[in-house]
Amino acid sequence: MTYVGAAEALRFPALEKVTGSMEITTSFVNGMYPTMLEEIYTPVLKRVGKLVMTSRANDETQYNTTITDLDCFSALERVDVIDIHKQGGLVSFKGLEKAIGSLDDEMSWLVGGNAYNPTFEEAKAGKLVKP
């Protein structure tokens, strides 16, 4: 499942499972200005193989700054890989707390280029919000 586009919101009210990769591009540069995804709604999503959030931006000034937390994934219980990059406003991973418990090792935690980038050890220890 891949989303690359310019919608303000992605809403999947009945989606419970993605067996493969769920890839969400949160900002898309069309011409000179980026369009940013503002909302992700997945209230019953319990399982994802690989969760990817990234941006098609070329530089930090075009990273998504509207998504500040991942509370949209608070129902997520199991994920094999979390890969989140280029989220300039992201300061809280608290919504992934249950899913982080299912991760096996630091190779399953790929995080960087965000406003907050907890290490695998910090995430497992519950340090999910930027101090």
PLM-predicted stretches and their roles:
Residues 1-131:
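Concave beta-strand-loop units of leucine-rich repeat
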